């Protein structure tokens, strides 16, 4: 899944998942220069691990003023990753992240990447993941199901190896958003599911 966004203002602390393992990663492509004062992404290093104090103690990091006497921007151990146009930041979906002071112009593209499901357990995790982190999960109609039409229409077989499984799972989860339903196409793809 991925998106292009035009952010304004603050994005409070949150993880994009709680998988407890490296299952998904977010790749953010920045289009504007961002500093700690103008909306740079902030990370809490190590917070993706189940044994990190934030997770172990079930700390609400957005309550830092009451808990630690510091504003959200100064959560203990957090860092700001300042970026320039063209910079890429990649992090584990379980990592707590935020952005503060974003003003009215904070443009970025993101891609959420997961590993291919090879076992029934992996397939269950991918289904849970795509039920939330996908066009259907966000209730966004792309006109082509899981991916923007250009992503699929320009894909050679090497790229389709990576796209086929999420497309099939997304179509099962959100059949009314499937490309063949939206565009009246037939699909005779061989299943990529385990």
Report each predicted region and the residues it spans:
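Non-heme Fe(II) oxygenase catalytic core, chiefly the N-lobe of the double-stranded beta-helix
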Residues: 1-85, 97-107, 111-128, 193-194
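Non-heme Fe(II)/2-oxoglutarate
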Residues: 88, 94-194
